[in-house]
UniProtKB/Swiss-Prot annotation:
Keywords: Acyltransferase, Cytoplasm, Lipid A biosynthesis, Lipid biosynthesis, Lipid metabolism, Repeat, Transferase
Protein name, per record: Acyl-[acyl-carrier-protein]--UDP-N-acetylglucosamine O-acyltransferase
Entry EC no(s): 2.3.1.129
One Gene Ontology cellular component annotation held by this UniProt entry: membrane
GO biological process: lipid A biosynthetic process
Known pathway: Glycolipid biosynthesis; lipid IV(A) biosynthesis; lipid IV(A) from (3R)-3-hydroxytetradecanoyl-[acyl-carrier-protein] and UDP-N-acetyl-alpha-D-glucosamine: step 1/6
Protein's gene: lpxA
Compartments where found: Cytoplasm
Organism per entry: Paraburkholderia xenovorans (strain LB400)
GO MF: acyl-[acyl-carrier-protein]-UDP-N-acetylglucosamine O-acyltransferase activity
Summary of subunit composition and partner proteins: Homotrimer.
Enzyme class: transferase
Family: Belongs to the transferase hexapeptide repeat family. LpxA subfamily.
Reactions listed under catalytic activity: a (3R)-hydroxyacyl-[ACP] + UDP-N-acetyl-alpha-D-glucosamine = a UDP-3-O-[(3R)-3-hydroxyacyl]-N-acetyl-alpha-D-glucosamine + holo-[ACP]
Length: 262
């Protein structure tokens, strides 16, 4: 049987695995589903059409599944889907999607969401992402796997943060960060390849060397973006361990709608 504190409120219709723990004064809404071994801290609110997987830890006073901060929202039954093994610390806010987008906000698996983080409507956060304290994601932001966002940073709506990239603390990001790149500042500018992070995740020396070469093409050689794309295509077909990550970088750049940081 679920271990629910007597002061907590679980509305009829909520579906909680029998191993879920709910702390004092927490509120669980009628359309919420919570998977096995998840713990919900005291005074937290999980509402809306929200689904959580297994082994999540929700800190006290977190607000999960709240209404989108979008004036066009008209009480449509939009959703929030959270995977498994996420840590969501105290006072974090995560909102459901809007019908103007896909109607769903998503958070993958194994993410570390620190205190006071905001994840706005229609955001899509991948796996193994770290969002440091007070990082603020506007609506429609997409964050790739293994990305890190520093504390006190603000991310503009519709911005994409590429996989394995890192945004330094107290930064203001208004355009896309390509995968594997370090960025920082107000406004955020590129500061090299995330070499240490790539080493920790098992990228080969050849792959890292290829990404460094790609970074020089994109940022150091004085090329226009279109000129840089031509050279990146050549690097992406050189043969070796570097081809796949350079292809990933190139595909991200070519798909950018807001433009990449430069």
């Amino acid at each position: 049987m679920s271990r629910i504190h007597p002061t907590a409120i679980v509305e009829p219709g909520a579906q909680l695995d029998e191993s879920v723990e709910v702390g004092p004064y927490a509120v669980i809404g009628a359309h919420v589903t919570i998977g096995a071994r998840t713990t919900v801290g005291s005074h937290s609110v999980i509402e809306g059409h929200t689904t959580l997987g297994e082994d999540n830890r929700i800190g006290h006073y977190a607000s999960v599944g709240g209404r989108p901060q979008d004036m066009k929202y008209k009480d449509e039954p939009t959703r929030l889907v959270i995977g498994s093994r996420n840590t969501i610390r105290e006072f974090t806010t995560i909102h459901t999607g809007t019908v103007q987008d896909s109607g769903v906000t998503t958070l993958g698996d194994d993410n570390w969401i620190m205190a006071y983080v905001h994840i706005g409507h229609d955001c899509h956060v991948g796996n193994n992402v770290i969002l440091s304290s007070n990082a603020q994601m506007a609506g429609h932001v997409i964050i790739g796997d293994h990305a890190i966002v520093g504390g006190m940073s603000g991310v503009h709506q519709f911005v994409r943060i590429g996989a394995h990239s890192m945004l330094g603390g107290a930064s203001a990001l208004v355009q896309d960060i390509p995968p594997f790149v370090i960025a920082a500042g107000n406004k955020a500018e590129p500061h090299g390849i995330n070499v240490e992070g790539l080493r920790r995740r098992g990228f080969s020396p050849d792959a890292i060397s290829a990404l460094r070469a790609a970074y020089r093409v994109l940022y150091k050689n004085g090329l226009s973006l279109e000129e840089a794309k031509v050279q990146l295509r050549e690097l992406a077909s050189a043969g070796g361990d570097g081809d796949e990550p350079v292809q990933t970088l190139l595909a991200f750049v070519e798909a950018s709608q807001r433009g990449i940081i430069r």
